[in-house]
C-alpha cells in the first residue's frame, strides 16, 4: 500500500511539473505570434502589448485568491480546473479574429495558469519530507 501511495504522490507531482512547463510556454507564446497578429489581423503594437500584458496581470492578481482556493479545495482539484481554463483560453486565442477575443483569451490563460505553481508548492509541502 505504501508503494502505491508513493507512486500516486510522484505521479501528481510530475503532472504538476509538466503543467508548469506548459505555463512557461503559454507565457512566452505571444512573443512568437506578434508578427502574425500585426500582419494578418492588423493589430497595433499597443494591442499586442496589451495581449501579452493581460495574461501576466491576471496571473499576478490571481495569486492570493488561487492560494486560498488551493487551501480550501485542494491542489488537485484547483489545478485541474486551472488547466481546463488555460486550455479553453489557448483554443480561443488560436481561433480569435478580433482584439477583444484575444484579450479575453489571454486573461483566461493567466487565470488558469496562476494556480499551477502554488499547487506544486502545496503538494511539496504536504507530501514530501524536508530532508
What are these regions (language model features)?
Residues 24, 28, 94, 110-118:
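Small-residue-rich segments within alpha-helical transmembrane domains of MFS-like 12-TM solute carriers
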Residues 44-52:
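Juxtamembrane helix-start elements in MFS-like secondary transporters
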Residues 42, 74, 95-101, 112, ...:
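Helix-breaking motifs and short loop linkers at transmembrane-helix boundaries and internal kinks
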Residues 28, 56-64, 114:
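Residue-level signature of mid-helix packing/kink "hotspots" within the transmembrane helices
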Residues 11-45, 66:
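Extracytoplasmic
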Residues 61-100:
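Conserved MFS/SLC helix-loop-helix module at the cytosolic interface between two early adjacent transmembrane helices
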Residues 16-24, 56, 90, 98-110:
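Helical-face signature of the major facilitator-like transporter fold
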Residues 105-131:
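Cytoplasmic helix-loop-helix junction between adjacent transmembrane helices
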Amino acid at each position: 500500500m505504501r508503494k502505491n501511495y508513493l507512486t500516486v504522490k510522484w505521479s501528481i507531482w510530475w503532472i504538476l511539473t509538466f503543467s508548469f512547463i506548459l505555463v512557461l510556454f503559454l507565457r512566452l507564446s505571444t512573443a512568437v505570434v506578434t508578427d502574425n497578429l500585426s500582419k494578418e489581423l492588423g493589430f497595433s503594437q499597443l494591442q499586442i502589448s496589451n495581449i501579452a500584458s493581460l495574461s501576466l496581470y491576471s496571473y499576478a492578481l490571481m495569486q492570493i485568491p488561487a492560494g486560498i482556493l488551493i487551501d480550501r479545495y485542494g491542489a488537485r482539484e484547483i489545478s485541474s480546473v486551472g488547466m481546463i481554463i488555460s486550455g479553453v483560453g489557448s483554443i480561443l486565442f488560436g481561433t480569435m479574429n478580433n482584439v477583444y477575443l484575444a484579450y479575453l483569451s489571454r486573461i483566461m490563460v493567466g487565470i488558469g495558469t496562476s494556480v499551477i505553481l502554488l499547487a506544486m508548492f502545496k503538494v511539496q509541502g504536504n507530501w514530501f519530507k524536508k530532508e
